[in-house]
């Protein structure tokens, strides 16, 4: 009788077990419609007060963007402002809204000639984030103050043609540091690109 229960238990246990095949997710194949890109690993370069970083996004030997930090004293409001900027030069464009801010893009967000609420401008100075320093305490402002691996849209104009791209950024308010991870720019003119692709 004991052996019968043991055999029945083992038989039931074997029937209740089933092999589960693991789900293997493969990376998506490259999109046949996405343009070929030039990528740069920026090695998580840090930009702090008193520092700046030039970026040659299209590898043509001249800088396209400048990231810098400025300390501005405001005696009227009795506060200081530690400001983190992204700057573009002639024929290098950043998206601007009416407050001179640029959108924070997520991975795979589209970047093209138009972006609702924003306009491409060359020779731009975009305030990414700022620390407001007062006698009553400090605070942070700006669209980019809490980002981690988000994308700044950029546009390069060469020979009258537009090339779209992005710079991957993070921000650390504790260290008061802007972090530059990667950049990408299309090699094909007037093509929509995906942020981070």
Task: Go through each PLM region and give its residues.
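Short beta-strand-centered aromatic/proline hotspots
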Residues: 167
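C-terminal motif of bacterial Sec signal peptides marking the signal peptidase cleavage site
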Residues: 13-16
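Sec-dependent signal peptide recognition
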Residues: 2-8
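Residue-level detector of alpha-helix boundary/anchor positions
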Residues: 9-10, 51
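A domain-level signal for the mature, folded cores of soluble proteins
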Residues: 21-163, 171-197
């Amino acid at each position: 009788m004991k052996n019968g229960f043991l055999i029945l238990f083992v038989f039931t246990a074997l029937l209740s077990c089933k092999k589960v095949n693991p789900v293997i997710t493969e990376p998506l194949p490259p999109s046949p419609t996405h343009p070929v890109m030039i990528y740069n690993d920026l090695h998580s370069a840090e930009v702090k007060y008193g520092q700046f970083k030039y970026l040659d996004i299209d590898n043509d030997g001249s800088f396209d963007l400048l990231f810098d930090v400025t300390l501005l004293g405001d005696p009227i409001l009795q506060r200081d402002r530690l400001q983190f900027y992204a700057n573009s030069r002639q024929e290098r464009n950043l998206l601007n809204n009416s407050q001179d801010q640029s959108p924070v893009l997520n991975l795979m967000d589209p970047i093209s000639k138009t972006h609702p609420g924003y306009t491409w401008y060359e020779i731009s100075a975009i305030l990414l984030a700022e620390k407001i320093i007062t006698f009553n305490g400090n605070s942070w402002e700006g669209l980019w103050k809490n980002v981690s691996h988000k994308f700044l849209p950029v546009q390069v104009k060469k020979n009258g043609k537009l090339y779209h791209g992005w710079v991957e950024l993070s921000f650390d308010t504790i260290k008061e540091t802007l972090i530059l991870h990667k950049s990408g720019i299309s090699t094909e003119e007037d093509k929509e690109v995906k942020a981070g692709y």
